[in-house]
Amino acid sequence: MNIKRAKQEIKDAVQAYLMKDEYGEYQIPAIHQRPILLMGPPGIGKTQIMEQISRECEIGLVAYTITHHTRQSAIGLPFIQTKIYGGKEYSVTEYTMSEIIAAVYEKIEQSGMKEGILFIDEINCVSETLAPTMLQFLQCKMFGNQSVPEGWIIVAAGNPPEYNKSVREFDVVTLDRIKRIDVEADFDVWKEYAYQVGIHPAVLSYLELRKENFYRMENTVDGKMFVTARGWEDLSRLIQVYEKLGKEVDREVVHQYLQHWKTAKDFANYLELYRKYQKEYGLERILAGYYEKDTLERLKFASFDERLSVVNLLFGKMAELFKEEYEMEKFVEGLFAQLCAYKEELQKEGAVPGEVLAAKIQSLRREVEQKKAAGQLTKTEMHRMERILCKLEEYQKAPEFESVKATFDSEEEQREQMADKTLETLNHCFEFLESAFGESQEMAVFVAVLNSNVYSIAFLRENDCAMYYKYNKGLLLDERREEILEQMDAVENVVERGLVED
């Protein structure tokens, strides 16, 4: 299955394991809560989905890569303890608490969350001395003589043997005690994540044209050659920073991240073309509603790769606007919620505006720090909360509610202006694409990416765009027509097989 489905399966299992009955006991006792084993190629986002699940379920997360540990750190250090058995004194070996189990208790203390996920990565790549410990961990949920705290779900991840020479196969006894999920790389699913985290448009545009290069793993006489989703994401970050620094990303730089020479060379060549199209087509003018007939003529006779690159360039610019508008929307919503609570506090007898607002800021800052310590905030959410706190601190200059409301109204007006500007730019995009391509495959691609980006979906849900509805309706009809034809072909094949058998 793909990583998106795997995430949902793990999330569902975690929610089921943590569900309690009317007596406050877990519906599925800890002994029957099978550890979840996520098996898949490296670099496809196994660790990232653990972070997402912990935030969405509002539980803790402790993550360890077990190959970084020795037997001593995993099960604890031995020490001699004196005990009396049958009236005689004996020296016995005890163990200190496992570093991993101690980290779980530390997380509980820091975050106040008594339930969570203990995630162990590369579990099937441990050394020979640690292998028995891992079997004990999966079978008994213990490290040494210490059990995993109640309410903490075990999730482990590993790589199939073809990706790692150090892999150790689990026996049937162990496999019969776990919930195994096999996951594969899937570009279309990764693309949704890529839009959320802001992967460079050139990377997404290239992979739309060369999906086969999204994930590659080959054995050659010179060793393994590979490309992973992690490699594309890290390369994207570098390109974005290099652009700000005015530095060049050539094939040598690309190969440092995409360790498959043919793919690295192909992407480096595409990146040069991408920048060329960016300059020659005058995207900023197109987004503003101005373009020349020569531009339309050139596109009509351009190669499919070039036409699709221009479509992706336009969407890359739109994606930035959609994300900016989304963040403005969330900022205003968050600020509005704080001001509603502030207004309610002011209605209490003896409330002093300045003191109430100061207390509100202090309370919110504590909440943010607690969520940050618990890993419950993304980087974007932290920036948004800091922005809200800064705005509340500005309100302290004139804390009377009428003054605060007047300032907030200007924020709301800016949000509306931004939404109007984004809608206007989107319409300009559609007008250009309509003039250049009409109801074509290129238009279908543009509508499809609009439907796969979380920020554009959120925008179109709140803002009516007639041209989007027009072409989206056509796209849905085409998809439905293809689905019906596929069903008819399937029925026809079944009938033909039946006739042959008769």
Residue positions per predicted region:
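General structural signal for secondary-structure boundaries
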Residues: 2-9, 36, 171, 186-189, ...
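AAA+ P-loop NTPase catalytic core and its hallmark functional loops
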Residues: 1-212, 217-220
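Alpha-helical lid/collar subdomain of P-loop NTPases
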Residues: 196-354
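Charged/polar, solvent-exposed surface patches and flexible loops
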Residues: 8, 12, 16, 55, ...
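Terminal-proximal interaction/regulatory segments of ATP-powered molecular machines
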Residues: 300-502
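Conformational switch/transducer regions in large eukaryotic molecular machines and scaffolds
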Residues: 35-37, 57-67, 80, 89-116, ...
